[in-house]
Amino acid sequence: MNNLQQGKRIVSLHSIIIIIMQKYIETPRLILRDWKEEDIPFFARMNADPNVMEFFLNSLSSEESFAFYQRIQNEFQTCGFGLYAVERKEDHAFMGYTGLHQITFDVDFAPGIEIGWRLAHEYWGHGYAPEAATACLEYTRKQPDITELYSFTSLPNLRSERVMQKIGMTRMKEFDHPLVPADHPLRKHVLYHIKTG
């Protein structure tokens, strides 16, 4: 194979990767899609909202949200999966995210893959989170390399735990999150699990 042929092959392979990354998932009311730069201000506003971040250690600054956005993009590129932006069909509004994320901190269920979600406060209470998470879960069932998923949240976060239950996950146990200080009220987490393969 000469250099020109090699170059064509690389370009072709690169195009395939881009197409895979830009696939999106539709539900009756939502689109789970690749991120756009215009999502970033809405993403930052969501991550700065104390209602949304009630069960996290801190709200995020604009700079921290942008760094988070970059990590999401990197995970799609390196793993082939990640956190999709969630868009409402009726008005194309950015609502938050739902998708998959590698578990890399020191726990007995790592390495593993987490299914997670975060929606802006104005979209709570309408069933959007379980609708998006169910669509992501069903898409994952078609991926032979992913056979199980985990989800977890701090014990007081009953809203998120209810989403885990609604999408068919099973409660496994409680655990101390190693990245939360030992004396912090959010250290105790609950872990859910589901088989996908």
Protein language model features and the residues they cover:
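Acyl-donor (CoA/ACP) binding surface of acyl/acetyltransferases
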Residues: R9, I17-P41, R45-E54, E87-G197
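Conserved GNAT-fold acetyl-CoA-binding loop/helix
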Residues: N51-I72, G82-Y84
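Short loop/turn motifs at secondary-structure junctions and domain boundaries
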Residues: E75-C79
